[in-house]
Amino acid sequence: MVGKLKQNLLLACLVISSVTVFYLGQHAMECHHRIEERSQPARLENPKATVRTGLDIKANKTFTYHKNMPLIFIGGVPRSGTTLMRAMLDAHPDIRCGEETRVIPRILALKQMWSRSSKEKIRLDEAGVTDEVLDSAMQAFLLEVIVKHGEPAPYLCNKDPFALKSLTYLARLFPNAKFLLMVRDGRASVHSMISRKVTIAGFDLNSYRDCLTKWNRAIETMYNQCMEVGYKKCMLVHYEQLVLHPERWMRTLLKFLHIPWNHSVLHHEEMIGKAGGVSLSKVERSTDQVIKPVNVGALSKWVGKIPPDVLQDMAVIAPMLAKLGYDPYANPPNYGKPDPKILENTRRVHKGEFQLPDFLKEKPQTEQVE
C-alpha cells in the first residue's frame, strides 16, 4: 500500500515537472518571438482587411509601413472639396484614405506651438526632449493613426484639411510623401461653411468679411508651403476644374502620385459602403454631398449671398483669390464648361436620384474643424 502511494506520488511529480518544463519552454519561445518582432519594421497584419475589390492580393498579404513610404496628404481650407478628393481616391482599389482623423492637425498644431515658443524650446532641450526626439515620436504617432484607423492598402492617404498648415514639417518627416492642396473660390468655401453651419475654430460664422479674411490667411499659409516643397511633391487641385473635368484631372493627379490609372475613381458613388471602397462618416458635413456623383451643383451657390460692402472690398479682403486665378469682382465668375457626363450627373442630382442611405443617417451633425 505504501509502495503504491509512493508510486502515485512519483507519477504526480513527474507530470507536474513535465507540465512546468513545457510551460517554461513555451514562455521562452514566446519571449524570443516578441524580441524578434520588436527588431523588425512595424507591420500591419489583418488578413480579412487586405482583401480589396480589384486587388489580386492573397488574404495573408502583409503591408509594411515606415517613414519612407509614399504617403498621400490631402488638405486645404474646409469646404474646398477635400472630402470629394479623398472619396475619389478611396474608390481606387490600391488606395485607402478613410475619414478625417481629427487628431492629426491637433497634434501638429501642438508641435508648432512648442517650436514657436523660445522658452518652451529651451525647457524641452534641457529635459532632453530635442527636435530629433520629438520628430521621431511624431513620425511614429502619425503613422500609427494613419495606418490603423482603416484597412491596409498599397497606398495610404490622410485627409485632415488643416494638416497642411504643417506641410513643410510633414514633408520633412515623410520624405517620400506627396501633398494634394485643394483650392476653391474662397467666396464659395465661405458661403458653404456659413450656410451649412460648419464651425471652424477662429471663424466667425456671422460675418462673411471675417470668414473671408481667415480663409485668405489659411490658404496663403498652405499655398506658400506647397510652393516651398515644390511641384514634384505638392500639387494644387482646383475644385472647380476637378468637378468640370474629372477624368482629365484624375489622370493628371494619379500620374503625379505614380499610381496606375483606374476608372473607378470616376464613379466613387458606386463604391460607398463596399468592402475596399469608400468609407464615410455619419458625422462629417460633406457626407450627404459625396454620396452623389461628381456634379457642378455647388459651383455658384454663393452668388447673390455675400453682402455688397464685402463684395466691393473683395480684392483687399481676400487677395489670394487673384493669386489662385479667381476674378475677385466676377459675380458669377466663368469657371468653364463641364464635360457632357458631368452635365448628365448634375441633371440626375437635381432630380433627387441620390439620397443618403439609411446606414449613414444619424442625428443632426455638429461638426467642428480645428
UniProtKB/Swiss-Prot annotation:
GO terms for biological process: post-translational protein modification. Glycans are attached at N60, N262. One of its GO terms (cellular component) is Golgi membrane. Its EC number is 2.8.2.20. Its main location: Golgi. Disulfide bonds join C97-C157, C226-C234. The keyword Transmembrane applies. Residues 26-370 are lumenal. Residues 1-8 are cytoplasmic. It is a single-pass type II membrane protein. Keywords: Disulfide bond, Glycoprotein, Golgi apparatus, Membrane, Signal-anchor, Transferase, Transmembrane, Transmembrane helix. It catalyses: L-tyrosyl-[protein] + 3'-phosphoadenylyl sulfate = O-sulfo-L-tyrosine-[protein] + adenosine 3',5'-bisphosphate + H(+). Homodimer. Can also form heterodimers with TPST2. This is Protein-tyrosine sulfotransferase 1.
